[in-house]
Swiss-Prot record:
InterPro entries: Scorpion_toxin-like_sf, Toxin_alpha-KTx_8/9. Disulfide bonds join C31-C47, C34-C52, C38-C54. This is Potassium channel toxin alpha-KTx 8.6. Voltage-gated potassium channel antagonist. Has a high potency on Kv1.3/KCNA3, and is moderately active on Kv1.1/KCNA1 (35% peak current inhibition at 3 uM of toxin) and on Shaker IR potassium channels (70% peak current inhibition at 3 uM of toxin). Negative results: does not inhibit rKv1.1/KCNA1, rKv1.2/KCNA2, rKv1.4/KCNA4, rKv1.5/KCNA5, rKv1.6/KCNA6, hKv11.1/KCNH2 (when tested at 3 uM). Keywords: Disulfide bond, Ion channel impairing toxin, Neurotoxin, Potassium channel impairing toxin, Secreted, Signal, Toxin, Voltage-gated potassium channel impairing toxin. Expressed by the venom gland. Belongs to the short scorpion toxin superfamily. Potassium channel inhibitor family. Alpha-KTx 08 subfamily. Residues 20-28 form a propeptide. Has the structural arrangement of an alpha-helix connected to a beta-sheet by disulfide bonds (CSalpha/beta). GO terms for cellular component: extracellular region. The keyword Signal applies.
Length: 57
């Protein structure tokens, strides 16, 4: 039973950590959609290795 509580506790802690941590700058957005995606965040669009990167203006 204590293993079940440990698993539930780990899942809850992981969920809280993922909620608190801000999203990483590299998003799963294609380079074609990058300018529109970054414009919604009021940031500058840049493509790195075919991945969209939003940078502060």
């Amino acid at each position: 039973m204590s293993r079940l509580y440990a698993i539930i506790l780990i899942a809850l802690v992981f969920n809280v950590i993922m909620t608190i941590m801000p999203d990483m700058k590299v998003e799963a957005v294609s380079c074609e959609d990058c300018p529109e995606h970054c414009a919604t965040k009021d940031q500058r669009a840049k493509c790195d290795n075919d991945k969209c990167v939003c940078e502060p203006k």
